[in-house]
Amino acid sequence: MEKLTLSFITLTVLSAIFTAASAADATPSQVVLDIAGHPVQSNVQYYIIPAKIGTGGGLIPSNRNLSTQDLCLNLDIVQSSSPFVSGLPVTFSPLNTKVKHVQLSASLNLEFDSTVWLCPDSKVWRIDHSVQLRKSFVSIGGQKGKGNSWFQIQEDGDAYKLMYCPISSIVACINVSLEIDDHGVRRLVLSTDQSFVVKFQKAYDSNSNCNLKSNSRMFLFL
């Protein structure tokens, strides 16, 4: 009886060890990594940059109607055409507030993190459905926790892609893609067949090389 009890305890301990080891092995594959190979941290500044070098720079806000004098009207998220511009840093706020690292396919909010902001709208990303243009733009002015502000990060080859994934909705996740408009502006829009493949670079310096300027549609180097 004593040997049987000892064997049971031994099996239980070994099972626990193997389970912990399996969980440890599985964790790295579930965590989003930055370009240095480190886990992307929640609520820490990162630049979202194209995965392919030489295909433009980082992400910044820009108003949709370039002919308007209201620089804060319909602020969409666009990609800088210059590969030397990192854009504005972004923070990721997961639905699960207890996690320290951003997980693959986990619901999260994105928000520009800039001390310089001239517009009254929030910096939280959201989806703006334009009935007139028949397009869905990735814009700012969202609200954390709201249905049109939920996104996910999913793998795309050796890089990642952003997905719009509303919670409590029959709508499946939709790719965030790039579309070049008639003015050559690279806007983030939703797409069923294309994706914007990106990587994440930790923002070590709070002074981005993309500065706010009111005389250039709010941001330089569109």
Curated annotation (Swiss-Prot):
Induction: Induced by infestation with spider mites. Exhibits Kunitz trypsin protease inhibitor activity. This is Kunitz trypsin inhibitor 3. Glycans are attached at residues 65, 175. SUPFAM superfamilies: STI-like. GO terms for molecular function: serine-type endopeptidase inhibitor activity. It comes from the Eukaryota.
